[in-house]
């Protein structure tokens, strides 16, 4: 069990700048008839999925639209969102969470009816089309029952995963897409193997938590699974090829329910959000670092030297009520050395906070520097913020076809900047939030080029 060293962690609370910027609203996406619970950006297509207590999943497509200055010069492209499709999932109760596979071809839905729904794009099922994102805002959209949708469904349910004995709270694909994890109020974490033709086989059922399991999340580049629970703990799991999946460490220190967890893009840190009003940052030390600091590595087995996760920061005093969600995204605009990205947090106080994270100037220090750089009060009026989620850095497939940037622009042009697509830098500036008011909102930092060009 990994026990937090509070003296070290408390010393690293984030600094407050003299003037904290607010967030700039890019889009407000309404339509859910009940609270919006969760969001997921498709990693391959320009689509943002949201789920709700109304049992529907709404797919919002986005494109990048050019704006022109008063002098007639073309300026930065900003995102424009439109409702692409409403999926009536058929779940009997709330859809609590949604997740995309890394190739963007599978959507999973976790429901309070204890099941996980598996959805595939119809054109991919029949093989009639290469995976592409249709972002044409003037496409075949009609109004029906107060909400627009495409004429024909684009996504179809191809399977239902059963086994949980109570509400299913979370679902997540591994970075390879070969494994799916789900968790439930029944205190269990299930691990499923993703097979061809939407076949899923249960590989393991883990009963490590003593209470309701709130969320599961995969490491961005390793087969490491994390889960967080009503029992205030975070557990990490790996697969022993000669045996089974097992919990190799438990992270303790939170004083109440852990609602959300998010790995850093580099994979060496983990952020967690809790009912104790804090966000905590944990750092992974490899075997050599453990030896240098006199710590014993955990998770050792054949071919694996082990590691240890320790608490290094407590972000306290930034939320007045439960912190329900945390998301760690890429920061492509930072010029600071040791850039580790940005953390966003949202909670029951209706506030969204954004923190910049950088490595310490002191090479001997294990604590990153954390600075509050933006804050949005009443992000969803008086409603709770249930989820915050940074957009992906770019729409690239792992080991597969790349979604061309032309699909994201209104002019079909490729925007080159320093050998990269300019929009790749800016995509990660988008932050989506979901609230108890049923709405989904898309924000950006006031310093972002989007804020200057959006209407």
UniProtKB/Swiss-Prot annotation:
Keywords: Repeat, WD repeat
SUPFAM superfamilies found in the cross-reference section: WD40 repeat-like
GO biological process: iron-sulfur cluster assembly
Each WD repeat, start to end: 31-70, 90-129, 163-202, 208-247, 253-292, 318-365, 380-453
Domain of life, per lineage: Eukaryota
InterPro entries listed in its UniProt record: CIAO1/Cia1, G-protein_beta_WD-40_rep, WD40/YVTN_repeat-like_dom_sf, WD40_repeat_CS, WD40_repeat_dom_sf, WD40_rpt
Residue pairs linked by disulfide bridges in the UniProt entry: none
Listed GO CC annotations: cytosolic [4Fe-4S] assembly targeting complex
Gene3D superfamilies assigned to the protein according to its UniProt record, in alphabetical order: YVTN repeat-like/Quinoprotein amine dehydrogenase
Keyword Repeat (UniProt): yes
Coiled coil: none
Role of this protein: Essential component of the cytosolic iron-sulfur (Fe/S) protein assembly machinery. Required for the maturation of extramitochondrial Fe/S proteins.
Family per record: Belongs to the WD repeat CIA1 family.
Record-linked PANTHER family: CYTOSOLIC IRON-SULFUR PROTEIN ASSEMBLY PROTEIN CIAO1-RELATED, WD40 PROTEIN CIAO1
Name of protein: Probable cytosolic iron-sulfur protein assembly protein 1
Higher taxonomy: Eukaryota, Fungi, Dikarya, Basidiomycota, Ustilaginomycotina
């Amino acid at each position: 069990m990994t026990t937090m060293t509070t003296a070290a962690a408390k010393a690293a609370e984030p600094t407050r700048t003299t003037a904290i910027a607010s967030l700039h609203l890019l889009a407000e996406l309404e339509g859910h008839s009940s609270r919006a619970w969760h969001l997921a950006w498709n990693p391959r297509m320009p689509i943002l999925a949201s789920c709700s207590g109304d049992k529907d999943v709404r797919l919002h497509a986005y494109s990048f639209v050019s704006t022109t200055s008063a002098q007639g010069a073309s300026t930065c492209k900003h995102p424009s969102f439109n409702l692409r499709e409403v999926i009536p999932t058929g779940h009997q109760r709330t859809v609590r969470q949604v997740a995309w596979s890394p190739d963007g071809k599978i959507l999973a839905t976790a429901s309070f009816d204890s099941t996980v729904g598996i959805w595939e794009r119809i054109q991919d099922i029949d093989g009639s089309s290469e995976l592409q994102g249709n972002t044409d805002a003037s496409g075949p959209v009609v109004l029906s029952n107060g909400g627009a949708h495409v004429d024909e469904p684009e996504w179809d349910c191809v399977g239902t995963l059963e086994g949980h004995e109570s509400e299913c709270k979370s679902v997540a694909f591994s970075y390879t897409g070969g494994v799916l994890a789900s968790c439930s109020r029944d205190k269990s974490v299930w691990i499923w193997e993703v097979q061809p033709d939407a076949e899923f086989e249960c590989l393991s059922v883990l009963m490590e938590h003593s209470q309701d399991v709130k969320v599961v999340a995969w490491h961005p580049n390793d087969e490491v699974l994390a889960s967080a629970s009503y029992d205030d703990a975070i557990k990490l799991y790996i697969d022993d090829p000669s045996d089974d999946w097992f919990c190799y460490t438990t992270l303790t220190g939170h004083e109440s329910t852990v609602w959300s967890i998010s790995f850093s893009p580099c994979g060496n840190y983990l952020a967690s959000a809790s009912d104790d009003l804090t966000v905590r940052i944990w750092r992974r030390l490899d075997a050599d670092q453990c030896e240098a600091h006199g710590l014993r590595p955990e998770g050792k087995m054949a071919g694996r030297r082990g590691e240890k996760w320790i608490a290094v920061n407590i972000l306290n005093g930034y939320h007045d009520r439960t912190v329900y969600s945390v998301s760690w995204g890429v920061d492509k605009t930072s010029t600071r050395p040791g850039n580790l990205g940005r953390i966003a947090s949202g909670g029951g106080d209706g506030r969204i906070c954004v923190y910049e994270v950088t490595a310490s100037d002191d090479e001997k220090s294990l604590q990153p520097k954390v600075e509050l750089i933006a804050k949005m009060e009443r992000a969803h009026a008086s409603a709770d913020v249930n989820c915050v989620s940074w957009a992906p850095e770019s729409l690239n497939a792992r080991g597969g076809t790349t979604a061309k940037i032309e699909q994201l622009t209104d002019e079909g042009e490729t925007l080159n900047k320093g050998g990269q697509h300019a929009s790749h830098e800016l995509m990660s500036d988008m932050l989506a939030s979901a609230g108890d008011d049923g709405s989904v909102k898309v924000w950006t930092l006031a310093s972002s080029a989007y804020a200057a060009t959006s209407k």
